[in-house]
């Protein structure tokens, strides 16, 4: 996260970290949505990875830290054919449930869609410099704004984004605050509701008039709830 500060240790109990199998690299974030399920971005998938819950500092473990591996992974249309503007969402079933503890608690799914102009919080262990490979030991948090989708469509003509999509656009038009590499899959929390999953943005991050895109959680609620309920054939909205 660019332009932020260390998150309060109590404000991110639902934030999980995806690590490579030997814990060498924290490569993505995710959100615990109940005791057995994590929501993240499809582009965070890799063959072997582990999920750490209840962590704050990568160097100083919390007593209630937990580690899990994926038991099952679900994608839209159960394929990985996500594009830059569509279906960048992955639902992970943990190999065993986690109990709530001091630093672990799920975040409920949104009850209403977000509105443009909302203040949204982003968080993660991703890069804190737009140009250098500088990663923090603790998650950083910052507030940005939910913008019109057009604001993400216009600055990136090379992506050929469609006129509408199941993507949210968020950032600060003057730049300086943004998610960055390593923050993918983490939550966008608008007015206290979990509304987005960090999907993609410009490189370097946090440039003026180059906001980032977040998968819209609200549009995928039926799919998420169906999968969790055991209907594994559920398909995402078209």
Curated annotation (Swiss-Prot):
Peptidase S1 domain boundaries: 1-229
Disulfide feature: 7-141, 28-44, 76-236, 120-190, 152-169, 180-205
Active site residues per record: 43, 88, 184
Gene Ontology molecular functions: serine-type endopeptidase activity; toxin activity
Regulation: Its activity is completely inhibited by PMSF, and almost not inhibited by EDTA.
Acetylation keyword on record: no
Gene Ontology, cellular component aspect: extracellular region; secretory granule
Tissue/organ expression: Expressed by the venom gland.
Highest taxon of source: Eukaryota
EC numbers on record: 3.4.21.-
Entry keyword set: Disulfide bond, Fibrinogenolytic toxin, Fibrinolytic toxin, Glycoprotein, Hemostasis impairing toxin, Hydrolase, Protease, Secreted, Serine protease, Toxin
Pfam family, one: Trypsin
Subcellular location(s) of the protein: Secreted
Glycosylation site list: 81, 100
GO biological process: proteolysis
Function recorded in the entry: Snake venom protease that shows fibrinogenolytic activities. Preferentially degrades the alpha-chain of human fibrinogen (FGA) and slowly degrades the beta-chain (FGB). Has no effect on the gamma-chain. Can hydrolyze fibrinogen without forming fibrin clots and also can degrade fibrin. Hydrolyzes the substrate of plasmin more potently than the substrate of thrombin. Shows a preferential cleavage at Lys-|-Xaa instead of Arg-|-Xaa bonds.
Protein family: Belongs to the peptidase S1 family. Snake venom subfamily.
Listed name of the protein: Alpha-fibrinogenase shedaoenase
Species, as recorded: Gloydius shedaoensis
Lineage: Eukaryota, Metazoa, Chordata, Craniata, Vertebrata
